[in-house]
Curated annotation (Swiss-Prot):
Name listed for the protein in its UniProt record: Lon protease
UniProt keyword terms in alphabetical order: ATP-binding, Cytoplasm, Hydrolase, Nucleotide-binding, Protease, Serine protease, Stress response
Primary location class: cytoplasm
Taxonomic classification: Bacteria, Pseudomonadati, Campylobacterota, Epsilonproteobacteria, Campylobacterales
Subunit composition and interactions: Homohexamer. Organized in a ring with a central cavity.
Domain Lon proteolytic: 600-791
Species name: Campylobacter jejuni subsp. jejuni serotype O:2 (strain ATCC 700819 / NCTC 11168)
Family assignment from sequence similarity: Belongs to the peptidase S16 family.
Gene coding for it: lon
Database matches in SMART domains: AAA, LON
Catalytic residue positions: S697, K740
GO molecular function: ATP binding; ATP hydrolysis activity; ATP-dependent peptidase activity; sequence-specific DNA binding; serine-type endopeptidase activity
Claim: Cell wall biogenesis/degradation is one of the keywords in the record: no
Stated induction or repression of this protein's expression: By heat shock.
EC numbers on record: 3.4.21.53
Primary role: ATP-dependent serine protease that mediates the selective degradation of mutant and abnormal proteins as well as certain short-lived regulatory proteins. Required for cellular homeostasis and for survival from DNA damage and developmental changes induced by stress. Degrades polypeptides processively to yield small peptide fragments that are 5 to 10 amino acids long. Binds to DNA in a double-stranded, site-specific manner.
Length: 791
């Protein structure tokens, strides 16, 4: 069949299937045939002396019409060569694109083929698109190996847009489906635009591939260089003998581990041994080597084998507590009881987990001696004291340790404390346990449950170490300011010992016996170089500090010592004498001063007693009546609970007025037809308005102030009171009684009214100097209060 016969289409042609490529017209392509279907199609074409239609397959080895594309190339067989392996090689030259319009036969494949004719494109648009395409191909050729110089020259010199497209598509690597889409596209303008876009994508892809290859080659070169340098360094170290350093370290670690073996859990021994073996195998230049070495040294620093051999001795503990602390009789007594039990358990070889399970928690205001009591215990037992501050702690890993997968991982504070103490049975103070925070990082109180529980703490697991540590020999003492903030499960496992405020007398003795000698020593002064008389000490306590403890008092003593030291050196004198007359030369002006009772009885002004975080205080409550409609106004930064107490008090007073238990003078009555309390607005004020105040204990104080203004009777100025009130006039118990009565004593109050339940329950805890110098009266109802207060 001659090429001129290509015009006699549609025509029936044998169909040969090509698995690998899309063939294009005007190209000579070798095709290898090794299956019977293609062999039969080839034989049919040769037999009929006809052209052959070559179609690409959709699926590998697809030989049915539904497994091949319906388009392909019409061409002739230029040569047929049998191969030794049984295959046949032919050279195929394509002439035109065609598509299957009718299936004639399946064995062999034969179909009616129709020519694919592309649209005609001429003019400037064709020239412009060809120029852009040729430029893109040139750019792609510069960064890839797709185009040979001859092919690139053919494309640059060509003018047949359709043929140039076929040459490019035959050269670049594209998927069969993409090639098919180009093959059947007859709009030449659209084909050029689409091909330009394809070449642009290929350019970008090749740039990225080239960049990645360059980086990979650069990295490989760097790695090879590092390896070469490390090998050189290793040989140098070997010549210098430094290569043996690691071997010495490994031997030292193994020796230390064997010495500690019988004192640690089996899992601890296995884990440390495993890490030593890993460290021995790993190259010292490996980044993991330093992490493993840090772990080994940390684990071996834990003092498994070191334990204080000092036996528990209750007499030593008692002696030390009394030597270091004045007063605090109840806390000291309870601590002595705790260690008496531990001593018996130890002597009779009873495991603590089988005995009394108690964790002591010392609570009270700042500066009252919570931590110093624990310090005295550690001295008596000859054990190290480790303080772990829990204030603001919200990450459980701070206690349990960080897993070694994290950068900067370290053991928890408990483990660090043992390492710092250099003994496995120190005294650990868990300071400010009431200030733990719960967050998304976990609940530290849950970890503390495990640490403090005798049934669990013998196998406490630190995440960093990944083995168990025995904490059963550690003495834990917790401290807190407000036990209501401690989580309930943790609170349930503790026994609380309250350290309440010091009285002025106790502070006087503490300052004279402990603070002044201690600060003199710290400031390099001798006892005969500074003199402070008793009256001055009392003045400093009452007017220069205001706290439950003695921390600020110590600061004042330190200030006196500093200024005395300066005075001794500058003025060349032998002794500094501080008294009430020259005290203001050494300390600033008075900061605190409890308002003394002035002895003037007034209507509507009552002395209340309040509790604050720094001790007790005398709180004035003032009330006035103004013509109005029975409204109640409250000022003085009062909290919700205190406001409710005022409303309860007002309602209770109304009932007493209606019942005739509070007599109203005629001069106060505005309209006999209207209740007197509906004729006035009541304004209650608590001075020092910038300070927030709250709580129910001012109930009887507010009630007395209202009763005073309606009865027009004065309130005794030397009487103070505290107690909650209910609507029936019953006086209910309150808290903080000791601090409140101490404040009343400081203010020269002669009589204090307190709820009867507090009188029966708490009076024994009130210092004798307060009880002996002030009349303390128990009240049951508000009628009792009026009996002792109104003049």
């Amino acid at each position: 069949m001659q090429i001129e016969e290509i015009q006699n289409y549609p025509a029936n042609l044998p169909v040969l299937v090509e698995d690998e490529l899309f063939l294009y017209p005007f190209m000579i392509t070798p095709i290898f045939i090794n299956d019977s279907s293609n062999m039969k199609a080839l034989d049919l074409a040769i037999k009929n002396d006809s052209m052959l239609f070559v179609a690409p397959s959709k699926l590998e080895n697809g030989r049915n019409f539904d497994e091949i594309y319906n388009c392909g190339v019409i061409g002739t067989i230029m040569r047929k060569v049998p191969l030794p392996d049984g295959r046949v090689k032919i050279l195929f030259q394509g002439y035109a694109k065609g598509k299957i319009i009718e299936q004639i036969s399946n064995k062999p494949l034969e179909a009616k083929i129709e020519l694919i004719k592309e649209d005609f494109l001429e003019g400037t648009k064709k020239e412009a698109l060809l120029e852009v395409l040729k430029e893109k191909v040139k750019n792609l050729a510069n960064i890839s190996h797709y185009f040979s110089p001859d092919l690139l020259r053919t494309i640059e010199e060509g003018f047949d847009a359709s043929r140039i497209c076929d040459l490019i598509l035959n050269t670049v690597r594209i998927k069969k489906q993409v090639a098919y889409e180009f093959f059947v596209l007859t709009d030449l303008e659209q084909k050029l635009v689409k091909l330009i876009d394809l070449i642009a994508q290929e350019i970008e892809a090749n740039k990225i591939q080239k960049e990645i290859k360059n980086k990979v080659h650069s990295r490989i070169d760097k790695v090879n260089k590092e390896y070469f340098l490390k090998e050189q360094l290793r040989q140098i170290q070997k010549e210098l003998g430094s290569d043996t350093q690691k071997e010495d370290e490994v031997r030292e670690y193994q020796k230390r581990l064997e010495l500690k073996k019988k004192f640690m859990h089996e899992d601890a021994y296995k884990e440390i041994k495993k890490q030593i073996e890993k460290f021995e195998r790993i190259h010292q230049d490996n980044s993991e080597a330093s992490m493993i070495q840090t772990y080994i040294e940390t684990a071996l620093d834990i003092p498994f084998e070191k334990i204080s051999k000092k036996k528990l001795d209750i007499k030593e503990v008692s002696k030390q507590l009394n030597h270091d602390h004045y007063a605090l009789n109840k806390p000291k007594e309870r601590i002595e009881e705790y260690f008496a039990v531990r001593e018996l358990l130890e002597k009779r070889k009873i495991a603590e987990k089988d005995g009394a399970k108690v964790i002591l928690c010392l609570y009270g205001p700042p500066g009252v001696g919570k931590t110093s009591l624990a310090n005295s215990v550690s001295k008596a037992l000859k054990r190290e004291l480790i303080r772990i501050a829990l204030g603001g702690l919200e990450d459980v890993n701070e206690l349990r340790g960080h897993r070694r997968t994290y950068i900067g991982a370290m053991p928890g504070r408990i483990t660090q404390g043992l390492i710092e103490a250099k003994q496995i049975n120190p005294v650990i103070v868990l300071d400010e346990i009431d200030k733990l925070n719960r967050s998304f990082r976990g609940d530290p109180s849950a970890v503390l449950l495990e640490i403090l529980d005798p049934e669990q703490n013998s196998k406490f697991r630190d995440y960093y170490l990944n083995f168990n540590i025995d904490l059963s020999k550690v003495i834990f003492i917790a401290t807190a300011n407000d036990i209501s903030n401690i989580p309930a499960p943790l609170r349930d496992r503790m026994e609380f010992i309250e350290l309440s405020s010091y009285t002025p007398s106790e502070k006087f003795h503490i300052m004279k016996k402990y603070l002044i000698p201690d600060e003199l020593k710290k400031h390099g002064l001798k006892s005969n170089e500074l003199s402070i008389d008793d009256e001055t000490i009392e003045l400093i306590i009452s007017d220069y500090t205001r706290e439950s403890g003695v921390r600020n008092l110590r600061r004042k003593v330190a200030e006196l010592c500093r200024k005395s030291a300066k005075k001794l050196l500058l003025e060349n004198i032998k002794k500094v004498i501080i008294n009430t007359k020259n005290l203001n030369e050494f300390l600033d002006k008075k900061v605190f001063e409890i308002e003394k009772n002035n002895g003037e009885n007034q209507v509507g002004q009552v002395n209340g007693l309040a509790w604050t975080s720094v001790g007790g205080d005398v709180l004035k409550v003032e009330a006035v009546k103004i013509k109005g409609k029975g409204e109640l106004t409250l000022t003085g930064s009062l909290g919700d609970v205190m406001k409710e107490s005022a409303r309860i008090a007002f309602s209770m007073i109304k009932v007493l007025i209606d019942e005739g238990k509070i007599k109203i003078p005629k001069k106060i009555i505005i309209d006999p037809k209207v209740n007197v309390y509906d004729s006035y607005n009541i304004h209650i004020h608590v001075p020092d308005g910038a300070t927030p105040k709250d709580g129910p204990s001012a109930g009887i104080t507010i009630s007395t102030a209202i009763a005073s203004i309606f009865s027009d009777k004065k309130v005794k100025a030397d009487v103070a009171m505290t107690g909650e009130i209910d609507l029936k006039g019953k006086v209910l118990p309150i808290g903080g009684l000791k601090e409140k009565l101490i404040a009343a004593y400081k203010a020269d109050i002669k009589t204090a009214l307190i709820p009867r339940k507090n009188y029966e329950r708490d009076l024994k805890d009130i210092p004798s100097e307060v009880r002996d110098n002030m009349e303390i009266i128990a009240v049951d109802t508000f009628s009792d209060v009026l009996e002792y207060t109104l003049v």
